[in-house]
């Protein structure tokens, strides 16, 4: 499955990163570091267009008209929800973990992946890695309509992350989970080889030598807010 997923991730990643680059050239869109205080205020205000319950209903209804700002508030605003824990792993994801390392799967195994990935996402709605596995299994079962819906969601959540910065030291990408750092790297067709926590609550992910010699040796991710909220909730 690793080989299959690697291919899918490269294809999706190229389109996502290319889209982010094209959008950056558009004067209407530039990567902007999020103002978390403003996001918190907006998602808690029932009269705001970004009120979290409104965004969540639109997300679940597969509203294709959701804007980038709405996706930014949906993704980043999840950190202010009661059940948020950046290091929580669903018990359901562990039930199918052994299947992830197989090169191919039987129809019954794909059914198992679909069952537990869906349960895992109900428990942890922004587990992007589970979304990837879920989409893969749906496609293997030729359930293309459902796969397309989840692919759309995944693509826009990844674009929301990419909209928060450039992956540089000066403008790191903001993530709500450390696992999302690796999802972003994989979706760019690269592989993480080393993780370095830096001062200022920033993670630096060194990647394998890219084919493009102009590409950076690694990418930066801002984890300050997730660490702050984790500390407020659990004191560790």
Residue ranges of model-derived segments:
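Boundary/linker segments of alpha-helical solenoid repeat arrays
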Residues: 128-129, 156-170
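Residues that mark the junctions of alpha-helical repeat units in TPR/alpha-solenoid scaffolds
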Residues: 88, 126-127
